[in-house]
Amino acid sequence: MNKTNPTIALVAGEVSGDILGAGLIRQLKAHYPNARFIGIAGTRMLAEGCKTLVDMEELSVMGLAEILKHLPRLLKIRKNVIQTMLQEKPDVYIGIDAPDFNLDVELKLKANGIKTIHYVSPSVWAWRQNRIHKIAKATHQVLAFLPFEKAFYDKFNVPCRFIGHTMADAIPLKPNRAEACQMLQIDPAQRYLAILVGSRGSEVEFLAEPFLKTALLLKEQFPDLQFLVPLVNEKRRIQFEAIKAKIAPNLDLHLIDGNARQAMIAADATLLASGTAALEAMLCKSPMVVGYRMKPLTYFLAKRLVKTDYISLPNLLANEMLVPEMIQEECTPELLAEKLSAYLSDDESAVKNRHILIQHFTDLHQKIQCNADKQAAQAVIDLLEGTENV
């Protein structure tokens, strides 16, 4: 490797990966001003100077049916990436998330003597644990956002570095509620519940009804309570409004385009689907209840496949039931309202418990606030310069 101008390959498959890739490139350019960056990039990575083989949108497919429909094209892109990398011989290949695409590329490149890093651990600790063996064969190192992920890799002697979470870097330890209310143009003197029904159509389909019915119950109990409903895009908004027209036509809601983070900071509590949103709510210091429903067959299979005691990231990080998880038959308006009312109550013990929970959230935030972009870049530098065992 030329010490001053390495060729660094990065492949991102969706917007979240493009954001990570851009942050990583920025840090690597500070160390290697003349480095060359190639791969599959979105607009942010392109702006940082990465050359792309194809438009990143070509890889952004969700759901089994969609993947099957686009499979020939995806396989063609993967073949093209492998051939290009074997010709270019980059000093390192960094697969950013998109494990179903990237791990096969990494496997081929590592077998041909190219150093590989997988950035963002697949959820092997939760399900399909046998993937760990493929990851071990495919990568020289995994970069993990969360400490329990590294602990899992350590058990299998797979090189892994905990780098902290970029979201923990982006959100202050003490979020500014007044600022969030101002951004959303809402009255800071009011009390709010944030309701996040998920970003996928299937989540809105299963969760909008119980979440709206929960809001109706809470409105009876707390007449002054207002509701903030951030929706990820126009499609989800139309879907949600159609369900609301049937379930709660007279319920006043603040429907918000995006801005989930500001909604959670402004709110006194949050009702949400599981997923990254639960981690974000924790970082926003918003007491939360996690509710989730899926098709009975999906739930039956998931229960047998998932190997963890908890499903939400705050509970996984704390390794205890910090926040209620109301899954499937427990995801009822009555139970959700009961759990949320404990956060919204003014009585002394409820206020004290809320303070204790927020302190837990702050402690966990500090644990994963490590300047992840910089840590990721350092891991790449160590691998390139031979200070990391390969």
Curated annotation (Swiss-Prot):
Pathway where it operates: Bacterial outer membrane biogenesis; LPS lipid A biosynthesis
UniProt GO BP: lipid A biosynthetic process
GO molecular function: lipid-A-disaccharide synthase activity; phospholipid binding
Keyword Lipid biosynthesis: yes
A Pfam cross-reference name: LpxB
Catalyzed chemical reaction(s): a lipid X + a UDP-2-N,3-O-bis[(3R)-3-hydroxyacyl]-alpha-D-glucosamine = a lipid A disaccharide + UDP + H(+)
E.C. no: 2.4.1.182
InterPro entries documented for this protein: Glyco_trans_19
Keywords for the protein's UniProt record, in alphabetical order: Glycosyltransferase, Lipid A biosynthesis, Lipid biosynthesis, Lipid metabolism, Transferase
UniProt xrefs under NCBIfam families: lpxB
Task performed by this protein: Condensation of UDP-2,3-diacylglucosamine and 2,3-diacylglucosamine-1-phosphate to form lipid A disaccharide, a precursor of lipid A, a phosphorylated glycolipid that anchors the lipopolysaccharide to the outer membrane of the cell.
Similarity field: Belongs to the LpxB family.
Name of the featured protein: Lipid-A-disaccharide synthase
Organism of provenance: Haemophilus influenzae (strain 86-028NP)
Name of the gene this protein is made from: lpxB
